Amino acid sequence: MIEFQRLHKSYSVDGRQIVALHPLDLRIGPGEVFGIIGHSGAGKSTLIRLINRLEEPSGGRLLIGDEDVTALDSQGLRALRRRIGMIFQHFNLLSSRTVAGNVAFPLELVGTPRAEIDARVAELLARVGLQEQANQYPAQLSGGQKQRVGIARALATGPQILLCDEATSALDPQTTASVLQLLAQINRELGLTIVLITHEMDVIRRVCDRVAVLDAGKLVETGPVTEVFLHPKHVTTRRFVSEAEHLDEAELHRDFAAVGGRIVRLTFLGNGTYEPVLGRIARDTGVDYNILSGRVDRIKDTPYGQLIVALTGGDQTAARAGFVAAGVQVEDLRV
C-alpha cells in the first residue's frame, strides 16, 4: 500500500513560496491500477515523483507498506528505488545502446551476473513483444516500440510498483490503446501496483481501478473510476468527462431548447447495458421518447451506456420507477 499523509510540496522562487502540491491524504492499494488526472500545472507529476523521492517533500509523510519513505537515508532510498520502476512520456532511452542493452542497463548498475541479465532481458522482451527488435537501436523504433522498451526496462529489477508519467501522451490513439492493454496485462499477471498520471480521462477509463483528480495542486475528487466517471462531482472532473465523451455542453443545451418534455440522463451499467429497457418501458407506460445523445462503451472491463432522452406523454412517474427497478440510474436534467 502507498499512503500519503498530509504530504505537500512547495518551491521558493525569488523569495516567494510557490505551492506545487497542497497537503493531501491518499491511499493506493496493493495491486491496483491507480490513475491521477489533472491539467498541466495541477501537481500530478510532482505527486508521482514524490513516491520515489525524485522530488523531496516539503512536509507530511509517505508510507510504502510500513516504511516511511520520507525518513529514508541514501542507502534506504537506493533500495526503495529498486522496488519502483518508472516509465516516461519521452521514453528516455539511451540512443547508443540496443533495445536489449537499454533493458539490461539497470541490471548492470546493480551488478547482476551477465548470464542472469541475458535471461532476464530475453524474458522481458518476450513479455512486451519485442524479441525481434533486441539488436535494433532506438532510432529504428516506432514510438510505441520505444515505450515498450521503457516498460521492459522499468520491470528489469522486479519492482513491486510501476510509475507511469504521461506514458501515452506522445503516442497516437491506436498505439496508446496497445500500450494500455500491455500495462493492464502486466498488472494482472505480475500483480504490480501501477500509478498512472495523465491529462486524458479516456486513459483513466480504459485501465484504472480508482482515480484521483488534481486541480491547482489540490486533491478535488477521488474514488472508483466507475463512480467518478459516471457521477463526477467537481467541475474539473465534469470537464474531463465531457472531453472524454466528446460532449459539448453548450450545444447539448441548445438541443434541450428545441424539444419539449422532461429530459433525463439514463445510465446503464454491466450486462443491463445491452437490454432493451427503454423500448419496453415506453410500451408499458405509454411514454414517448426522443434520444438526444447516446453512447455505449466500457470502463475498464465493465460495459456501460448513457442516453439523454426527452420524455413526453404517458405515465412518466411509472416510467421512472421502471427504470430504477431495472437497475438504470436516472438523473433529471430538466423536469
Swiss-Prot record:
Pfam (any one): NIL
Catalysed reactions, semicolon-separated: L-methionine(out) + ATP + H2O = L-methionine(in) + ADP + phosphate + H(+); D-methionine(out) + ATP + H2O = D-methionine(in) + ADP + phosphate + H(+)
SMART domains referenced in this protein's UniProt entry, alphabetically: AAA, NIL
Any GO MF annotation of the entry: ATP binding
SUPFAM superfamilies for this protein: ACT-like (SSF55021), P-loop containing nucleoside triphosphate hydrolases (SSF52540)
UniProt-listed Enzyme Commission number(s): 7.4.2.11
ABC transporter domain: residues covered: 2-241
InterPro entries hit by this protein: AAA+_ATPase (IPR003593), ABC_transporter-like_ATP-bd (IPR003439), ABC_transporter-like_CS (IPR017871), ACT-like_dom_sf (IPR045865), MetN_ABC (IPR041701), MetN_ABC_transporter-like (IPR050086), NIL_domain (IPR018449), P-loop_NTPase (IPR027417)
Entry GO terms, CC: plasma membrane
CDD domains: ABC_MetN_methionine_transporter (cd03258)
Membrane topology: Peripheral membrane protein
Cell compartments where the protein resides: Cell inner membrane
Keywords from the UniProt entry: Amino-acid transport, ATP-binding, Cell inner membrane, Cell membrane, Membrane, Nucleotide-binding, Translocase, Transport
Class of enzymatic activity (EC top level): translocase
Binding site for ATP: 38-45
Family label: Belongs to the ABC transporter superfamily. Methionine importer (TC 3.A.1.24) family.
PANTHER family: AMINO ACID IMPORT ATP-BINDING PROTEIN, METHIONINE IMPORT ATP-BINDING PROTEIN METN
Subunit structure comment from the entry: The complex is composed of two ATP-binding proteins (MetN), two transmembrane proteins (MetI) and a solute-binding protein (MetQ).
Biological role: Part of the ABC transporter complex MetNIQ involved in methionine import. Responsible for energy coupling to the transport system.
Protein name, UniProt field: Methionine import ATP-binding protein MetN
Upper lineage: Bacteria, Pseudomonadati, Pseudomonadota, Gammaproteobacteria, Lysobacterales
Gene: metN
